[in-house]
Every structure is written in C-alpha cells, then in structure tokens.
Regions:
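Transmembrane alpha-helical segments that form core, pore/gating elements
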Residues: 40, 52, 62-66, 122-124, ...
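Specific transmembrane alpha-helical segments of multi-pass solute transporters/efflux pumps
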Residues: 34, 38-39, 67-115, 151, ...
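Membrane-interface helix-cap regions at the ends of transmembrane helices
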Residues: 37, 41-44, 48, 61-78, ...
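Hydrophobic transmembrane alpha-helices of multi-pass small-molecule transport proteins
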Residues: 2-6, 66, 88, 92, ...
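C-terminal-most transmembrane helix of multi-pass membrane proteins
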Residues: 2-17, 22, 26, 59, ...
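Helix-helix packing/entry segments at the starts of transmembrane helices
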Residues: 56-57, 111-119, 179-202, 234-270
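C-terminal transmembrane-helix exit sites in multi-pass transporters
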Residues: 65-75, 118-140, 262-282
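Hydrophobic/small/kink-forming positions within alpha-helical transmembrane segments
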Residues: 33-36, 40, 67, 89, ...
C-alpha cells in the first residue's frame, strides 16, 4: 500500500487534474481490464484441462517471466524475506485454487464481483489479527456486500457452492493483503513477488502431481489462457502496477482497481453469455457499492496497522 499523497476528498477533477498521473491511471485501468478478461479465459481453460495443473503452469510462466529481472535481487531478501514470500505465495496459491474452483461452478460475473469483496473483508481481517479499529464506512460496506452476495447466490441453487468457494478465496486474499503489510516496506517488491510466485508454483505443482493431474497443455484455449494469465495478468501486470503506483496517489489507484469487477461483468456478458437477471445484477450493484464504500476504509486500516506495528517495534527496539 502507498501513502495517500492527497486527500480522499479531492473531488472528481483531482483524479484527472495532474497530467503526470493520467498515463498511470490509464495503465492501471488497462491492467484491471486484463484481469477482467482472464476470468472468461480461465473458465474455458479449466473446463478441458485440470485445475491444479493449469494453475501450476500459470505460475511457472509468471515465475519464469520475472526470474531474470529479479534474480540479482533475491539475495537481498535474506532468510526472513524468502520465508515470508514463500508463506504468502502459498496463501496466494490457496486463494487462486479456491477462486478457480468456484469459477468452475458459477458465472464469470459472479466470480468477479465476489472476488472484489476482498476489499470489504480486509478491515475485518485486520480487526481479528491486530484489533484494528474500523469505522462505519467499512461496516456499511460489509452490510451492502453481504446483501449483494445473498441476492447473487439466490439466482439459482447450483451457484451457491461456487459463490462460497470464491468468497473463501476473497477471504484468503484479504489475509494475504493484511500480512503483506508486514513485508512490503522492508523488502524489494520485485524480488519478493518473484519468491511469492515461485512458492505458489511449487505448492500447486505438488498438489497437481499428488492428484495425477499434470499433463502437457494442448490447444489454444488452454495455452492462450496460460500466456495471458501467466505473462500479462501476473508478471507484466505486476510490473505495470508497480510503475503506475509510484506515479499516482492511493486514491487514484483505488479508483482504478475498483474497475476490475466492472470489466469482469462486461466480459462475462459479452464473451461468456452471462445473463444474471434483475436480482443477480442488483446483487452485483450492491457488492460494487460495498466495495466503493469500504475501499478508503480498507486503505486507512492498513496504513494504521503498519504505523502501529512500526511504533511498537520502535519502542521495543530503540535505536542504538
């Protein structure tokens, strides 16, 4: 997370008022569009290729893409950084496994919006782990998103299992985000992310081997999804995100990231044929409203968690 370099009340004109920030904002929105279209590709791919094998190859490609630029930096992480990156990488693998298993059982649009609930769940995870204070906006986001989830899952009974799996994935992503705040200020971002993706690859590979699911991917449906998710959505998506976030504020970044469920719904409707009906789209709208309401609260909670942990470390280990 970045420090908010301008107030959240800057207004709509502030989003585009700084010409230097416009390319960064456009880049972030492009990344969210790529993330959105991958839901359609992954759903098609895992229909014909085993889930854990697909995810293992995806993270193998992502790790290989980042290996060269990150190789010289990994040593600088030390044992603590490598161990932390490996642990968070395994959490990442668990999140993707749950999300993809849910995607197999529900619609693309539902998966995108429910995944976005990680924003709503992040303050709750911080409350459980660090007793962080969360305001009314965060609780309002929880209420809206929960109501939206109930509406979305009420479309047809067959989607409930898939929706709950995706919700579990969102909870894992929230846990990873909160724990990441322990490491983000201390370690090189590129090297740390490489370790995360490599650990995710190893974990998913072991599961695929244990299940006997590993095989050579065949056909453009599978390979196209692997290349887009492995190279563009994961590796290059991270690099663009890192470049853009250094050139814009946390407020603009939050605005861009909130577009991911919207892109997912767009591609789900146009490419996957999602037809959710009034109740389903109403649920999506409620979840989106909850995300937008909770986003600033989630960012503030994480900033406060980092500040409090830095303060406690400073008191227990004074400078020499």
């Amino acid at each position: 997370m970045l420090d908010d370099r301008e107030g959240a009340s800057a207004g709509a004109f502030a989003v585009f008022g700084d010409n230097r920030a416009v390319p960064a904002l456009v880049a972030l929105i492009f990344v969210t569009a790529v993330w959105g279209v991958t839901f359609v590709q992954v759903k098609d791919a895992v229909a014909i290729y085993p889930l854990f094998a697909f995810l293992a190859v995806r993270f193998a490609i992502a790790s290989a893409t980042l290996a060269f630029p990150a190789a010289k930096r990994v040593r600088g992480l030390g044992r603590g950084g490598v161990a932390g990156g490996a642990f968070l990488g395994l959490l990442l693998a668990a999140g993707y496994a749950l999300q993809t298993a849910g995607l197999e059982r529900t619609t693309v649009s539902s998966t995108g919006f429910i995944t976005g609930m990680y924003v709503v769940l992040t303050p709750l995870i911080a409350l459980l782990l660090y007793r962080a204070r969360i305001g009314l906006a965060a609780w309002g986001g929880v209420v809206l998103a929960t109501a939206g989830l109930a509406m979305l899952s009420g479309i047809h009974a067959g989607s409930v299992t898939g929706d709950l799996l995706v919700l579990a994935a969102a909870a894992v992503y929230s846990l990873q985000i909160v724990l990441m705040e322990r490491y983000a200020p201390r370690f090189d971002a590129l090297a740390f992310t490489f370790v995360e993706m490599a650990a995710a690859f190893v974990g998913l590979l072991l599961v695929a081997l244990a299940l006997g699911d590993l095989g050579v991917p065949r056909g453009w449906t599978v390979w196209g999804a692997l290349l887009v998710t492995g190279v563009f959505a994961s590796a290059l998506g991270f690099l663009v995100q890192t470049w853009a976030q250094r050139r814009t504020s946390a407020t603009r970044t939050a605005l861009a990231f909130s577009m991911e469920p919207v892109w997912t719904a767009f591609f789900g409707y146009t490419l996957a044929g999602d037809r959710l009906g009034a109740l389903g789209w109403g649920g999506c709208a409620a979840i989106m409203a909850g995300i937008v309401l909770a986003e600033p609260a989630a960012a503030a909670v994480l900033v406060n968690v980092v500040a409090s942990r830095r303060g406690s470390r400073g008191r227990s280990r004074p400078r020499r």
